Amino acid sequence: MTIVLIGPMGSGKSKLGRRIARRLGKPFIDTDKVVVAGHGSIAGIFAEFGEEHFRALERVAVEDALAHDAVVALGGGAILNAETQDDLASRRVALIMVSAEAVVSRIKGSKRPLLTDGVSTWAEILESRRAIYERLATRTWDTSSRPLDAIANEIADWAQNGN
């Protein structure tokens, strides 16, 4: 069974995903890392080819990742693609959220191309995507103040037992 983590930039999807995968004995796939490994930095892709090109590369990475029995962390904007939304309808999807206050230190100095203005841009992006995240999510966790190990244990239990 594929477990998918979605949520805004800086919410902890990658860190949680690695921990959950270890607990479940599954591979971990971070679709942003897959794109970077094959095509260079996300900032570079945005600068040279634009967001639309990046989203096309991301879609290929998502489609491939979802074909595996793995824990998969999607980039924050991957859910904007209608095919990806359709693909997630039949999967266990964990929405990983974080407050604006908690994300400030996580994104400080970030080279993420959509965060040029920091937390205010982050909050705008989150609000523009929130309804999609919530519609796709099977269950939601907040990483603002709880230890990631505790959250990873809960998600692993949920993945195995459905509760």
Q: For each of these PLM feature ranges, what is it?
A:
Residues L5:
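Hydrophobic anchor at the beta1->P-loop junction of P-loop NTPases
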Residues G12:
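Conserved glycine(s) of the Walker
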Residues I29-D87:
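ATP-dependent small-molecule kinase phosphotransfer cores
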Residues H39, E58, L66, I107-K108, ...:
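Short, flexible helix/strand-to-coil boundary loops that buttress conserved ligand/catalytic motifs
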Residues G76-I79, S99-E101, R146:
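Short glycine-rich anion-binding loops that position phosphate/pyrophosphate groups of nucleotides
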